[in-house]
């Protein structure tokens, strides 16, 4: 399978961070973005190192009433084919709904595939900083018995395109502020519709070119 280049990991991190800041296109959201790191909430679930949350995100989870957008990173683990330790990044949206916060987690896999306790551990960490219960809504799994794995056509020798996917979902959210007016149930329906449409586009050619072309065009490369 041929892949388009440059790969996101071949682009300077500061350029990826700059694009993330550039996509802050709606004042309906609060953007808890670390100016020095692509990831704002970092979970080191593989070796048990304590999580690291950007100070601006910790403050926003507790005090900001607007929906908060940030990027979450976590460990996938060692990959023998790539001879590398793989990490993953996910665009995340925290919304106060009732007496709790729902974090809409625009991932592409079931977190139980990483670890049975991973989701509950992340929820506990976010809740600690928010001061209220936090529930993680895995966007890949809202409307199907089997989660939608949007990276299934990337091939065994590729990693890092999650950098592009995080920007894709960020642009979707900032370009669709009406999403925030929906009920929690209707938010899930809108997410399921988005994932289904993207999944169909991926499935027709059975390639990873959708996100590759998106990222390269977005970055002007």
Where are these regions (language model features)?
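Surface-exposed polar/charged interaction patches
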Residues: 24, 59-63, 129-132, 176, ...
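Charged/polar, solvent-exposed surface patches and flexible loops
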Residues: 55, 59, 120-128, 213
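C-terminal folded domains that constitute the principal catalytic or ligand-binding module
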Residues: 138-220
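Cysteine protease-like catalytic core of ubiquitin/ubiquitin-like
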Residues: 64-174
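Cysteine protease catalytic domains with a Cys-His-Asp triad
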Residues: 1-91, 96-103
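Residue-level detector of alpha-helical secondary structure
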Residues: 5, 12-21, 127, 191-195, ...
